[in-house]
UniProtKB/Swiss-Prot annotation:
Signal peptide coordinates: none
UniProt keyword list: Nucleotide-binding, Nucleotidyltransferase, RNA-binding, RNA-directed RNA polymerase, Transferase, Viral RNA replication, Virion
Function of the protein: RNA-directed RNA polymerase that is involved in both transcription and genome replication. Together with VP3 capping enzyme, forms an enzyme complex positioned near the channels situated at each of the five-fold vertices of the core. Following infection, the outermost layer of the virus is lost, leaving a double-layered particle (DLP) made up of the core and VP6 shell. VP1 then catalyzes the transcription of fully conservative plus-strand genomic RNAs that are extruded through the DLP's channels into the cytoplasm where they function as mRNAs for translation of viral proteins.
Swiss-Prot/TrEMBL GO biological process terms: DNA-templated transcription; viral genome replication
Record-stated family: Belongs to the reoviridae RNA-directed RNA polymerase family.
Compartment annotation: Virion
Annotated Gene3D superfamilies: 1.10.357.80, 3.30.70.2480
Name under which the protein is recorded: RNA-directed RNA polymerase
Taxonomic lineage: Viruses, Riboviria, Orthornavirae, Duplornaviricota, Resentoviricetes
Length: 1167
């Protein structure tokens, strides 16, 4: 075991957070608050105050002293937190300006901007200006980076003044705020800190780019920028802004984007000068730079010829593996001509990414491609583009419809779509009757999210009237007052309110906010269709069939095709899919007539059709389709003087439950129609594989025709259906669902923007938990392409500003890294290397383990707000839950007491979705944690449960360790992390979802799930089993009956003696969830028994269930160990005698019975 690594990490982290503190405050005083052991408990006391430098020297002296490593770790673990006293409250913004000046001076002493960089920046600036002039008619005033005062002068209507001069409103100007979880000056200071500690490692090119970016940051910082303060007020009043002649519209965004480019400067491999070009272009065309600079990738992926290997895959989607043979290269003249023509017309000729692309078409090495690909990912980090909702939605739904279409093709499309839907709906109605006795109320309402219902109305909440838009509260209001909520059609005809979504490099998109009735009606239909698609129905055409455990390798078939180059791969992109003509009348009438036809097919009568709250699901579905065919969209821009807009719309509504799966069906029907018509003129085409995902599609085919002929013909066929498409064809590369598959390798872009966000962060979460999710996103970017140096840099930027908690105006607590990297309201819930959950302790001493458990658990606080309990006893809540309970009882044909209690608990938790309730919960938790910290002398009881790493250490102490042989292997699924690669080389890559040892079968859970309309989790079973006396037959019988199990099933289950086995499995079900192994690059590891046995060989007489649980615990701990230390091993544990064996087995079983697993906010099911 490697305590040295842990010691080095812990000391470095404490020192880093301290030196950052001394950088951003003037003369702070710091004092250690230490833990003292007092047999039963620990108590804390504060030591004398020092300067941060003195404290850093003290920590340094501990690390360099001659005591043992374990004692050094103990000395550092005893630091519970460090109090920081700040007397001089001078403005941090002035300090940041001094730091900026100092940093720029320091870089200038080392280098100056070369002609090469200067030319690159000037050239792209001129090209961006020209592009702006040529495309000016499509620009809105807020797309120009102009003075805010000029914008206000000509666009008064974009603003609403408030009573408080700092509380004015403007949708448009608010869209220009970057939304980060710290103030802009704090971001700059942490970027300066992270670069300063690496200063000696930069090469000349990196220094030049740093100089350029820091100068841009300084210019915008000195000129001033508009920001929204934490108290939700603006930094400037309108009067100030009208007078100010230096604040530009995009200043804050340019600062944040420049900071992002400084972070990507640490990616390996990358073209440094291109990052400067991104900012130069972004300063000129802020709303369009990302899209324009990234666009050549779509074409390049189809023509670049990588040096790679042939990939073979079986017809099982998930199986694919690279062979030794080199891949086959294939590029036709017509493809090169198309590329050259496009590139000659490309407006940004000086883009260094495009220059690299032009040089690298044939025989490209993976490293060069990675550099180009990372440049492409970098363009998205300038942040989210936010347009005014009215302008964006108007552009989104504008489509010219025509009657001049190919009638025959339209008929084919309509009949195909109708036939597919008819078969599905007939099955759906029968399944609901046999499974739930036709009442699907409980399932539909249980799945309903507490999102907006589109408009605000007054409802009673506990003891007060509140105005709210929440679906749940509207539903409760309707039910408790017995209002008529069944004429959905009329409601939709009044108009559909619109929301928006923002993404980097794309225009703002509108989202339809439909009423709760639509969600309730469509839920079971959508679920049924998804389930069918997931099981690989419809010839495994739907991407949903590929999202199960091995999502990572489902693109195996496509990887194989691109490596052999024997099939033509066609990916078509329909622009404005939702509003296209085939999605208007044909799509809606296919749904309506499919329902009518399905009714003639099934064996149940009208009264047995599924119902929700007394409404017939199929009747209402027809009503919804009819209403949506010709709907009015209401688009408001509330933070402006713009009048609400009403727009006539006929397309698909993104906001229905059935949108995505409905799109996939329509897409299959559309492609099939196009190809049926194509084979008349091109009989040599043989379609091999088809995959759709919403409006995305890919088809692979064998053909004797030329590639450009096929492309032209396809476009022409789509045109005859009035669908505007880009049809891209290639033999060796394609893009689907944001993944790029080229010559047998799969790349994912690291395009998660960290320093900007789509919406402002809620005030209800602590800075620590938002920072945790940012570290997680940074880790995903690093694993996908930017590499380990980028992740280290990002933790240095993200952690120090979030490492301290404000206690009073002058006092802050700088938390111990151990507390920060654990779970709870003041923790990141993530490890420094990007795995979700708690940082592990790599130390073998028992005393250190005790200290460590205290530091990780004393702040894990959870509070249930009173309002949840109060609301659950109101008539409004009762109205909803009573309807749901009676629906469960009809569906299960029994009382099902436990199921109905679980239902009530789950519905109670939804009250958290009400504004203020969640905020109250999180604020109370944070306050309690702060109080816990501020008590000077506090007694902390010791933790008696075992942490999983204690089992890991126990096995290691009793094993012989050897260095494993790592297999070198060719990657299909690309990642850029040394340690993930090591893990893959030792335990392999998940190549199939086939022969792994499955999660042991929990028969009890299966029986309950079979009948229960609501989702039941294993922990629910454990909780309720404690309320029954399971030692005698009657207790067991009552428990099972209350779960809704009866008749023969009950008899057989009782006789099978499986109850205790299943309850044990339920207890450890959490082990089958890997906390936050969400980066797909980690999901490519086969986290199962076979993999565990490659690392651990354990010959102990353990019962089978315990053996599996032990192996899983060891495997997760091993993944954490390798990701942290970068070392691998193989462990063999064979006890020398029977006595030792018996003793070990007893200890292990006790530990597993008393294990304490992380409770985390996010986790992934990996089985």
């Amino acid at each position: 075991m490697e305590p040295e690594n842990y010691l080095a990490w812990l000391a470095r982290d404490i020192v880093r957070n301290l030196s950052y503190t001394s950088l951003v405050y003037n003369n702070p005083k710091v004092a250690i608050v230490e833990l003292l052991d007092n047999k039963e408990a620990f108590f804390t006391y504060e030591k004398e105050q020092k300067t941060p430098e003195a404290l850093i020297n003290y920590i340094d002296s501990i690390v360099k002293s001659s005591i043992s490593v374990e004692d050094k770790i103990e000395a550092l673990l005893k630091i519970r937190y460090i109090s920081v006293y700040v007397d001089d409250k001078s403005d941090k913004r002035d300090i940041v300006l001094q730091l900026l000046n100092r940093t720029i001076k320091k870089i200038e002493s080392k280098t100056k901007i070369s002609n090469e960089l200067n030319d690159a920046i000037n050239a792209i600036t001129i090209e961006s200006r020209n592009w702006k002039i040529q495309n000016s008619e499509s620009f809105k005033p807020y797309h120009y980076n102009q003075l805010v005062s000029d914008f206000l002068k000509y666009n008064e209507f974009e603003i609403l003044e408030g009573t408080d001069p700092l509380k004015w409103k403007s949708d448009t100007l608010q869209g220009l705020s970057p939304n980060y979880n710290h103030r802009t000056h704090t971001l700059i200071s942490s970027i300066i800190y992270a670069t300063s500690v690496r200063f000696d490692n930069y090469n000349d090119e990196q220094l030049q780019v740093l100089l350029y970016l820091f100068s841009i940051i300084k210019t915008n910082y000195v000129n001033g920028y508009l920001e929204i303060l934490p108290n939700r007020k603006w930094s400037h009043s309108l009067a100030d802004l009208r007078e100010n002649k230096s604040i530009m519209m995009y200043s804050a965004k340019i600062i944040h984007a420049s900071c992002a480019m400084i972070s990507i400067l640490h990616a390996v491999p990358i073209d440094y000068f291109f990052l400067a070009q991104i900012i130069a272009s972004f300063s000129e065309i802020p709303a369009h730079a990302a899209k324009q600079l990234s666009s050549p990738m779509t074409l390049y992926i189809g023509i670049a010829q990588l040096r790679s290997n042939i990939v073979v895959s079986t017809k099982i989607a998930a199986e694919s593996v690279a062979t030794e043979s080199p891949n086959i290269s294939r590029l036709e003249e017509s493809q090169l001509r198309e590329w050259e023509q496009e590139m000659n017309e490309y407006p940004f000729q000086s883009s260094r990414m495009v220059r690299m692309m032009k040089k690298n078409i044939f025989d490209v090495s993976v490293d060069v491609f990675y550099a180009i690909f990372n440049c492409f990912s970098a363009t998205f980090h300038v942040g989210h583009r936010i347009d005014n909702p009215q302008d964006a939605i108007e552009a989104q739904v504008k489509v010219e419809y025509t009657s001049d279409v190919d009638k025959e093709m339209y008929d084919q499309y309509y009949f195909l779509l109708k036939r597919m839907l008819t078969d599905q709906l007939a099955e759906y109605a029968e399944e609901m009757y046999f499974k739930y006795n036709s009442d699907v109320t409980a399932e539909s309402l249980a799945a309903m999210a507490n999102s907006s219902n589109g408009y605000s109305r007054s409802v009673t909440f506990i003891d007060r009237e509140i105005k709210t838009t929440k679906k749940m509260l509207h539903l409760d209001d309707d039910l408790s007052k017995n209002l008529n909520f069944t004429n959905i059609g009329e409601q939709i005809k009044k108009g559909i309110p619109m929301g928006t979504r923002n993404v980097p490099a794309r225009q703002t998109r509108g989202i339809f906010i439909l009423s709760w009735q639509v969600a309730a009606i469509q839920h079971t239909i959508a679920e049924f269709l998804y389930k069918k698609a997931k099981k690989g129905g419809f010839g495994a055409t739907f991407a949903e069939a590929y999202v199960s455990k091995a999502a990572t390798l489902t693109y195996g078939i496509l990887a194989e095709a691109t490596s052999k180059a024997d099939q033509l791969i066609l990916y078509t992109d329909v622009s404005q899919w939702d509003a296209s003509q085939h999605n208007t009348e044909p799509y809606r009438s296919a749904w309506i007539n499919a329902i009518k036809e399905a009714r003639t097919k099934y064996k149940i009568n009208y009264n047995q059709e599924p119902v929700v709250l007394g409404m017939n699901v199929l009747d209402k579905m027809i009503e919804i389709q009819e209403a949506l065919l010709n709907s009015n969209l209401i688009v408001e821009s509330q933070g402006s003087k713009r009048q609400p807009l009403r727009i006539k719309y006929h397309g698909v509504a993104s906001g229905e439950k059935t949108t995505k799966i409905g799109n996939s069906f329509a897409n299959v029907a559309l492609i099939t129609t196009v190809f049926n018509n194509l084979t008349n003129t091109m009989p040599s085409i043989r379609v091999n594989h088809m995959r759709v995902d919403g409006d995305d599609n890919v088809v692979t085919m064998y053909t004797a025709n030329r590639i450009d002929e096929v492309q032209e013909n396809i476009k022409e066929k789509y045109k005859r259906m009035n669908a505007k498409v880009k049809a891209l064809a290639s033999y060796t590369g394609l893009e689907m669902a944001k993944r790029f598959i080229i010559c047998g390798k799969i790349f994912e872009r690291g395009a998660i923007s960290i320093f900007t966000a789509e919406r402002p962060y809620g005030t209800d979460l602590s800075v620590q938990s938002t920072t945790g999710s940012l570290i997680y996103s940074a880790a995903v970017n690093a694993y996908r392409g930017f590499g380990d140096d980028y992740l280290n840099f990002m933790t240095d930027v993200l952690v120090p500003p979030s490492a301290s908690v404000k206690i009073t105006g002058r006092l802050r607590s700088l938390l111990s890294p151990v507390t920060l990297y654990s779970t709870g309201p003041l923790s990141f819930e993530i490890t420094p290397y990007g795995l979700g959950g708690r940082m592990r302790l790599f130390s073998l001493s028992k005393e250190n383990m005790e200290l460590y458990k205290i530091l990780t658990s004393s702040l894990a606080i959870s509070i249930q707000p009173d309002e949840i309990k109060k609301y659950s006893s109101t008539p409004q809540f009762k109205a909803r839950v009573d309807r749901m309970i009676s629906s469960v009882q009809i569906a299960m044909k029994s009382e099902a007491k436990i199921i109905t209690s679980i239902l009530r608990d789950k519905e109670e938790q939804k009250t958290l979705g009400v504004p203020n309730v969640a905020t109250a919960k999180n604020r109370q938790q944070i306050d309690k944690a702060r109080k816990t910290l501020s008590l000077p002398k506090e007694i902390l009881p010791k933790v008696t449960k075992y942490y999983p790493e204690e089992i890991f250490h126990l096995i290691l102490r009793n094993s012989t360790l050897t260095i494993p042989k790592l297999n070198t292997m060719t990657k299909v699924y690309m990642n850029n992390s040394v340690n993930i690669t090591k893990l893959q080389q030792q335990i392999g890559v998940r190549v199939s979802s086939g022969i792994q040892v499955h999660k042991p079968i929990n028969t009890l859970l299966k029986l309950v799930e079979k009948h229960s309309p609501i989702k039941i989790s294993p922990s629910d079973l454990i909780l309720y089993s404690k309320k029954y006396d399971l030692t005698n037959l009657n207790g067991k019988k009552q428990f099972l009956m209350d779960l809704g199990i009866s008749g023969n099933e009950l008899r057989f289950y009782l006789n099978s003696k499986l109850l205790f086995h299943d309850l044990l499995l339920s207890k450890y079900d959490k082990l089958y969830e890997a906390p936050g192994f969400g980066a797909t690059q980690l999901n490519a590891l086969p986290l199962d028994l076979t993999a565990a046995e490659k690392v651990f060989s354990i010959k102990l007489n353990l019962p089978n269930t315990y053996y599996e649980l032990l192996m899983l615990v060891l495997l997760y701990e091993y993944v954490n160990f390798v990701m942290f230390t970068g070392n691998t091993f193989r462990a063999v544990c064979i006890p020398e005698s029977q006595t030792i064996n018996a003793k070990l087995v007893k200890t292990i079983m006790t530990m597993i019975d008393n294990i304490q697993l992380d409770t985390v906010m996010f986790s992934d099911n990996i089985f």
